[in-house]
Design a protein with these regions (language model features):
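Short loop-to-helix capping motifs
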Residues: 14, 140-142, 186-187
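Amphipathic alpha-helical segments enriched in hydrophobic/aromatic residues interleaved with Lys/Arg
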Residues: 101-115
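Hydrophobic, amphipathic alpha-helical faces that serve as interaction scaffolds
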Residues: 66-69, 81-100, 113, 126-166, ...
Length: 215
């Protein structure tokens, strides 16, 4: 965070940075790679090194990736943390949403339901992630938003998928529609109840897909 940058958040080349900080170029390369893995900087040919805005989910991802691949933590524990955070913050988050965001959520639900009906072989994973994370964005809590974003990365890394039972998927998005309706009508407690019902339904349908190994 204390690295010297210009107005475009560009960081000097390593040879210059080495002189400014009194650190060897080899050590800086190691630190740069670590910073890049945490989403602190980006490195591009010709463009050089640029410091990125802080993203807590990017900082979490390397550790979570290691933990999931190494079997150090269980998916269910992280999913339970996500569930509790969403439910605890839901009413505060819903009250913070303006009509523009509510209308966007409404449109997202409508377009996704249409896609499910017209293209039943397509699972709306990206839309599902956006629906759940967008509700909490206006709280501007980087730690909360980072963990909620990281949940979807962990879900992907875990190898857990929802079987393409599209009657079930449509039901999930009908829950989303009802949640948005309650938010629009300022019935926040009712919206929270629907969110909890939806999450219980979602958790019941999560099944691991066994990974095949070949010797």
């Amino acid at each position: 965070a204390a690295l010297p940058v210009d107005t475009d958040q560009r960081i000097p080349p390593l040879n210059i940075l080495s002189k400014q900080l009194g650190i060897s170029v080899a050590t800086l390369r190691e630190q740069l790679e670590e910073a890049r893995s945490m989403g602190v900087v980006e490195v591009k040919p010709k463009a050089g090194i640029r410091k990125l805005p802080y993203d807590f989910s990017a900082a979490l991802k390397p550790g979570l990736t290691y933990a999931m691949h190494g079997g150090c933590i269980s998916y269910s524990q992280f999913a339970d943390l996500r569930k509790h955070l969403e439910t605890v913050y839901f009413i505060e988050a819903a009250q913070s949403l303006d009509y523009q965001v509510i209308n966007y959520l409404d449109d997202l639900v409508t377009s996704t339901l249409t896609t499910i009906k017209e293209t039943p072989g397509k699972v709306p994973v990206k839309a599902h992630r956006e629906f759940h994370t967008l509700i909490y964005k206006d709280l501007k809590n980087q730690y909360l938003n980072g963990i909620l974003e990281a949940f979807w990365d962990v879900y992907h890394l875990s190898g857990l998928e929802v079987y393409p039972d599209f009657t079930y998927i449509e039901r999930v998005w009908q829950y989303h529609a009802r949640i948005v309706e309650q938010i629009r009508n300022c019935n926040y407690s009712a919206g929270l109840s629907l969110l909890i019902e939806h999450m219980d339904l979602f958790n019941q349908r999560e099944k691991p897909i066994q990974r095949l190994t070949f010797e």
